[in-house]
Curated annotation (Swiss-Prot):
Catalytic activity reported: L-lysyl-[lipoyl-carrier protein] + (R)-lipoate + ATP = N(6)-[(R)-lipoyl]-L-lysyl-[lipoyl-carrier protein] + AMP + diphosphate + H(+)
A single GO BP: protein modification process
Gene Ontology MF, one: ATP binding
InterPro entries, per database record: aa-tRNA-synth_II/BPL/LPL, BPL_LPL_catalytic, Lipoate_ligase_A, Lipoate_protein_ligase_C, LipoylTrfase_LipoateP_Ligase
Subunit structure: Monomer.
Annotated gene: lplA
Protein name, as recorded: Lipoate-protein ligase A
HAMAP family given in the database record: LplA
High-level lineage: Bacteria, Pseudomonadati, Pseudomonadota, Gammaproteobacteria, Enterobacterales
Pathways per UniProt: Protein modification; protein lipoylation via exogenous pathway; protein N(6)-(lipoyl)lysine from lipoate: step 1/2; Protein modification; protein lipoylation via exogenous pathway; protein N(6)-(lipoyl)lysine from lipoate: step 2/2
Record keywords: ATP-binding, Cytoplasm, Ligase, Nucleotide-binding
Length: 338
């Protein structure tokens, strides 16, 4: 019986693909070597310890229907579209070795006519007249008895969108998370015009088979053809939940400030696990009571635009004379935290 397993995803859903990855990693036999090839439609994927409000322009992501997905490995934030090919290598210990999987990807690129090399801990680069250009980034995860190496290859990604979603609004945001490093990148299509996801996947598969000296049939998976994986439904539900993607953010503080015709407002929030643990309101308004009441109401709430907006609008019943101000405040808060 082969010790290899090859999975190909037909789904562009990042939550589906990451749930598949998680289930296989947890349940694979320690003697198995797994290759999983996949790609995501418009998604910002953040590292396990990152703060989405710090790393991402969450408001623009919402406007453009870009998903947020938190992975289980560390590292920085990346933007995925269908111009990225994603790969995951898994193996039990002591065989797990990220240098082996890196060598397989480099061999695949070489077979396509691209000479690349490893740079630092996480990247693959090609040398150009303008210097090294990054074509692949990776992240890793290890447990007591197994490990995985996953990463992306830039084929024909819309690089202009990296800045759209990975550069947050310039807010007074202080955080304890990890800040992403955004280096010079290049698409493989610049070196190999017409290169496709299918060609890259086939090259990686062949390099995988060649390294281990055996072959195996691919398992093609999709939401309509889900793999037989115990607890997959529960894993997918967690992977797609707000509590995982946003609520797992490291503790941070956020300061919002704005001047309205009726006065200036400062809101100070301390947020842990996606919930407000402390809220303070400061204002030079002649009627500060609604803001003081709002600060008290927000403690314990999820740090979500719609939740904060609802809490603000709920105060209209207590302060009907300030209805116009509260509605204006509500709209501003909703926009500021998205």
């Amino acid at each position: 019986m082969s010790t290899l397993r090859l999975l190909l995803s037909d789904s562009y859903d990042p939550w589906f693909n990451l749930a598949v990855e998680e289930c296989i990693f947890r349940q694979m036999p320690a003697t198995q070597r797994v290759l999983f090839l996949w790609r995501n439609a418009d998604t910002v994927v953040i590292g396990r310890a990152q703060n989405p409000w710090k790393e991402c322009n969450t408001r623009r992501m919402e406007e453009d229907h870009v998903r947020l997905a938190r992975r289980s490995s560390g590292g920085g934030a990346v933007f995925h579209d269908l111009g990225n090919t994603c790969f995951t290598f898994m193996a039990g210990k002591p065989e797990y070795d990220k240098t082996v999987s890196t060598a397989i990807v480099l061999a695949a690129l070489n077979s396509l006519g691209v000479t690349a090399e490893a740079s630092g801990r996480n990247d693959l680069v090609v040398k150009t007249d303008s210097g090294d250009r990054k074509v692949s980034g990776s992240a890793y995860r290890e447990t007591m008895d197994r490990g995985f190496h996953h990463g992306t290859l830039l084929l024909n990604a819309d690089l202009s969108r990296l800045a759209n979603y990975l550069n947050p609004d310039q807010k007074k945001l202080q955080a304890k998370g990890i800040t992403s490093v955004r280096g010079r990148v290049a698409n493989l299509v610049e070196l190999l015009p017409g290169i496709t996801h299918q060609q890259v996947c086939e090259a990686i598969q062949e390099a995988f088979f060649s390294h281990y000296g055996e072959r195996v049939d691919a398992e093609v998976i999709s939401p309509d053809n889900t793999p037989d994986l115990p607890n997959f439904a529960e894993t997918f539900a967690r992977q797609s939940s707000w509590e995982w993607n946003f609520g797992q953010a490291p503790a941070f503080s956020h300061l919002l400030d704005e001047r309205f015709r009726w006065g200036g407002v400062e809101l100070h929030f301390d947020v842990e696990k996606g919930h407000i643990t402390r809220a303070q309101a400061f204002t030079d308004s002649l009627n500060p009571a609604p803001l003081e009441a709002l600060a008290a109401r927000l403690v314990g709430c999820q740090y979500r635009a719609e939740v904060l907006q609802q809490q603000c609008e709920a105060l209209v019943g207590d302060f009907p004379e300030q209805e116009a101000e509260l509605k204006e405040l509500s709209a501003w808060i909703a926009g500021a935290v998205r």
